[in-house]
């Protein structure tokens, strides 16, 4: 019953309160962990037996979890986590970086552990809960959009469309799980209608990153479905090459010229160009330098480096670079970037090994959707955004995958 509640709650509440994902997913992970521990504890038939039996079963569970952890082939993940931890020692504010590190990698650890548990029971009902939760999230968006924030204004003084950006990002990646479920059930028309509905929703939202990510996800789905013999190699080469070239390109662009020509009515997008250009030049000065985990917001900026654009003063690095590649390179250096791209390569290879064509295509689409949003928006280490990725991973592995013969 608890699983139904959370699987419905995360996408629905997440639409109007995106940051809630950090709390709801964390609680969901903890409850799942406790449920699996409780399953190993025998019923208390008699008091003499219970304490010993409980202790033995807990030890067996811990042993199984440890063995599963070792069997997860997470050497690259451990190297990356270790490098992030080392970077905290060289951070501008070491204590803050260490606290952020513990928060991020605690939820990642919980997510990886729970994702290797047994598949969910009563999956048909859980799938319905996810579909209803996603549709409720879509309905809440349109309620807010056409009522100018009726629900939001109950709790806040005013409403702006950008307040739904996080909810739109969550919807864009969760929708791929629902699409995978509908396709597996041979409900192709509802799957297509859902894609078009979400695409339309994102097009009228203020979340350009989610719209681009979901649009490219659709293109990737089609390509992965119809040119499967070479698609795996193409996407790995394209994504890693593009990621490596991005800091170079960002350092060479003329942000003012591009903004004047293409982004006169999109100040937020124009500001992104100035941020990327500034961060890329900072990286070029000392490419091996480690600024520390999640330390972008503490980067010192001179008065002469402030941006003066059309009479407005913009900060060249407000909080974070709004690009996962630039942020990781700035904070962790080229070694950190190499480890991060090794993870990207590993996960794309794992997706490429999925035997079921539709599930593989949905997984590629979801991965690209998440990656593209990270290339345009959000701090790569934001808890709610990390929790969103863990949420989708668990749904794919424990809710969708068990009903499909997928691994070669």
Curated annotation (Swiss-Prot):
Q: Where in the cell is it found?
A: Membrane
| Transmembrane residue ranges | 5-25, 72-92, 94-114, 130-150, 163-183, 192-212, 230-250, 325-345, 359-377, 380-400
Membrane-related topology note: Multi-pass membrane protein
List UniProt keywords, sorted A-Z.
Membrane, Transmembrane, Transmembrane helix
Superkingdom to which the source organism belongs: Bacteria
Q: State a GO cellular component annotated for this protein.
A: membrane
Family in the record: Belongs to the O-antigen ligase family.
Q: What is this protein called?
A: Putative polysaccharide ligase RBE_0399
Natural source organism: Rickettsia bellii (strain RML369-C)
